[in-house]
Amino acid sequence: GVQTCALPIFFALTLLALIVKGPKFKGKLKYRWNIPLVLAGFVLFAGVTQLALEKRVLSNYFGNIAFAYEDYGYPYCLGVTIFDTGISCPRDYSEKEIKRIEKTEENLPETREGEYPNIIFLQLESFFDPELVNYLEISEDPIPNFRKLMKEYTSGYYKVPSVGAGTANTEFESITGMSLRYFGPGEYPYKSILKETTCESAPYVLGELGYSSHAIHNNEANFYGRRSIFPNLGFDTFTSAEYMPEEDDKNPLGWTRDRVLTDEILKCLDSTEDQPDYVYTISVQGHGAYPEEPELEEHEITVTGSPTASKNNQWEYYVNQIHEMDNFVKELTDRLEDYPEDVVLVMYGDHLPTMGLTVEDVDNKYLFQTQYVIWDNMGLE
């Protein structure tokens, strides 16, 4: 895209300006030695970088670009984000080749006609089971409702592309089914290609089956550019915090509480008659950065076991926020249980919280996953 091309062009123009306008060496250049040394330097750098990638000392996939710059340094990260722009266009990519592929799919069974259920996706900000953190002592289960649903309905671990940040990338993968590994390191499709074009997505596919598609987010519409991105993803409507009557229901960090989403989801379901709805909901209450100082209000749930007092304060704040989010999950499922139409509700966390967790800190030994549960009011088995 334009943004991707601009970086190498800017880099090249800056280098050219330095060559033309920069100070000149007055001595005699020893080209016989200097040129081979420069070439050898490039070859050595490329070889060492490739070896480091093979040995997993370096990575060309950044789950959190800020952490990547801390781990691998500025020169490597800058270089890899400039020159690695993701998967290349296949050599045989053409209209003729696509038509040939389409012909091979002609014998697939057709989608059965009938009544389809409403589909709700609920992406919960930084939501996961803190009891998986092996050094924490928590006074009571912070997510009893979500845990009960995981036992009673289809559930498991949900692989996500980021850690501690990158909500929009989990969102992108969930809406499109495309992996971020096809993009450049640290790239946000919301900030690059989707600003210019559309792509295949759940709203477009479900639209062919008669679905109306809605996006809901209890944060401002311009966050991650969603206001302009969601139309390109095929959503018919987008309701952001600015249009919610209870927008002022804030947590101590100023994020709108997730309980305001229940009525907004039901409004979307009620907005269409004789038509199923796809409602993609993004929560925000669990967002950081979490306070290192203790809060004035006494928390319902206490947390101990963190290596420092400041980290313990962060965990206690976080645990009590996801406890409120868990109460919201119960309120939502209770309301949907009595809804007169069929509903399938998919709930999952977008990524782990920004707590500096390592694989040794969590019982499941993997940082790129949260939990999911698929609930319904239809008695599915």
Which residues does each PLM region occupy?
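N-terminal secretory/membrane-targeting segments
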Residues: 1-2, 6-117, 138-157, 192-196, ...
